[in-house]
Design a protein with these regions (language model features):
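N-terminal intrinsically disordered, acidic low-complexity segments at the extreme N-terminus
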Residues: 1-29
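Amphipathic alpha-helical scaffolding segments comprising HEAT/armadillo-like alpha-solenoid repeats
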Residues: 32-35, 59-73, 94-112, 130-144, ...
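Residue-level detector of extended alpha-helical repeat arrays and alpha-solenoid scaffolds
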Residues: 81-82, 119, 151-152, 251, ...
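Short beta-strand-turn/beta-hairpin segments enriched in glycine/proline and small hydrophobics
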Residues: 171-187, 202-225, 243-244
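A structural signal for short beta-strand/turn segments enriched in small hydrophobics and glycine
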Residues: 194-206, 232-241
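Short inter-helical turns and helix N-cap capping residues of alpha-solenoid HEAT/ARM repeat scaffolds
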Residues: 77-78, 114-115, 146-147, 178, ...
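Core register positions within helices of long alpha-helical scaffolds
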Residues: 88, 125-128, 157-160, 164, ...
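Short histidine-centered loop motifs in beta-beta connectors
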Residues: 181-196, 225-234
Length: 302
């Protein structure tokens, strides 16, 4: 029995497939030109490279040579470079690196630097070596800094010097930040209560007839928004517009310091963190209990 053959009709776009079926003839594939390939791979490489370069330039863990450290400490155009150098300094100091002493005068100089984040990091760094000449006095002056975070870090560092002069500032680290409206007007934008916020994070915007643009209200501390006036709310200058609870790390460091220098008067600020609540971590709760116990033991109170 002969097997009939099948062929495509003349002039059609069909062809016979290996299984004997017919179908449209596949269109020829268009390959990218050399220029297109170069552009494609270059774009892909940049997509990967640019975030890496940003991370590399902002990551404070990247090691700096002695020359780079000196340059970064004086880079007024890039305050984050100064912060990077201070973090590296603190690490060297904590490991008793004698070579780090050559930059100690720079740490004292930066104690009144105009950028808050630099002063904040500087206060922490000076606490890494209690033998640093001039550090103690510089930290005492920083207790009067306009920034609550700088005051707090200076107070924490002073504890390493066995100096409890900053105890009120340490207790303040346990308390929420109350933010008042700088102008009278109405809220046009605001974040939601319960939202985590970093230091300097935007909380709300207030518009008034006297200003061409809304005034931004920012958080002075890292933490979580407890309350904030919502859009449409009228506010008057000096009235409370937001409350931010301190972050876990800040609270934990303050409790550790008060374990050493706390007094009975500080217990009302400590005991809220002893509660078994979802927003209080086990580490913080345990530290609060230990701090409470240590303070009462020093005072001879059961």
């Amino acid at each position: 029995m002969s097997i009939p053959s099948y062929s495509a009709a003349p002039g059609s776009d069909s062809q016979i497939h290996p299984d004997g079926s017919t179908g449209p003839e596949p269109k020829p594939k268009h390959s990218m030109s050399r220029t297109q390939k170069i552009l494609f791979f270059t774009t892909g490489w940049l997509i990967v490279l640019m975030p890496f370069l940003f991370w590399w330039n902002t990551w404070f863990g990247r090691h700096l040579s002695n020359q780079q450290l000196t340059e970064y400490l004086h880079d007024d155009k890039k305050p984050r470079h100064i912060q990077h150098a201070l973090v590296q300094m603190g690490d060297r100091m904590s490991h008793a690196d004698v070579a780090a002493k050559q930059w100690y005068p720079e740490l004292i100089r930066l104690a009144d630097y105009p950028v808050e984040q630099v002063r904040n990091t500087d206060a922490w760094a000076m606490g890494q070596d209690t033998s640093g000449a001039g550090f103690h006095q510089a930290l005492l002056k920083m207790l009067a800094d306009p920034s609550p975070m700088v005051r707090g870090n200076a107070a924490l560092s002073l504890v390493r010097f066995a100096d409890a002069a900053g105890r009120p500032q340490i207790v303040a680290l346990l308390q929420p930040a109350m933010i008042d409206a700088p102008i009278s007007g109405h809220v046009v934008d605001a974040d939601r209560p319960g939202t985590a916020v970093h230091q300097g994070g935007l909380l709300a915007k207030v518009a008034s007839a006297d200003s061409s643009a809304p005034v931004e209200i920012r958080s002075p501390i890292p933490g979580r928004i407890r309350s904030v006036s919502q859009p449409g709310t009228n506010v008057v200058v000096g009235a409370e517009i937001a409350v931010v609870d301190p972050g876990t790390e800040q609270v934990w460091e303050a409790l550790r310091a008060l374990y050493l220098v706390g007094q009975l008067d500080d217990l009302p600020a400590i005991r809220p963190y002893e509660r078994d609540l979802p927003d209080i971590s086990n580490d913080v709760r345990q530290q609060a209990l230990e701090t409470d116990k240590a303070i009462r033991a020093r005072a001879g109170v059961n």
